[in-house]
Amino acid sequence: MQRTAIGLALVWVALLAPVADAHHSYAMYDGSVYKVFTGVIVRIIPNAAHFEMHFVPLNEQRDALVRDDKGQPLVWVAQMESAAQALKDGVTRESFPQGTVFSMGIHPRRDGKPAGDRGMSGLFQCAKGTKPEPGKHCDSVAGNKAFGAGEIPKEGAA
């Protein structure tokens, strides 16, 4: 009887372990603030738990990539919900190939690392071969495409 109970407990733990491991707390992100970016896709990582968009922001004039202290492109990581939700919204490697210009807001990491969570922000892709006017985002470009619900949030407090 005791062996059966231990066996069942082990099976239960084994079944729940992937669920517990698949998600993490959002405490690392400042959900009270949005940073809004227009950037260029470097790569897409469709992780099952959290879809990631790696990108380099464009400067406010929209004519150059933002660079770090060493002159290298400053790559940010935008975490989204699951790959299944991203697919439902139409966000795939094929719909966002390397070099795609897009805009979205993210809740930045509290530790200052160049990463954040999309939250409820809209995601807009500029029409191929276009970019926004200085200080604007892809939602202002003729022929833009929206992915999922939401609008580009205002920079600052959410």
Regions found by a protein language model. Give the residues of each.
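PEST-like low-complexity, intrinsically disordered acidic/proline/serine-rich tracts
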Residues: A27-A158
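Generic detector of short, well-ordered, non-transmembrane alpha-helical segments enriched
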Residues: P18-V19, S95
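Positively charged n-region of N-terminal signal peptides that target proteins for export
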Residues: M1-T4
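Boundary at the C-terminal end of the N-terminal hydrophobic targeting segment
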Residues: A20-A27
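Bacterial N-terminal signal peptides
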Residues: G7-A17
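Short amphipathic alpha-helical "recognition" segments used for binding
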Residues: I6-G7, A83
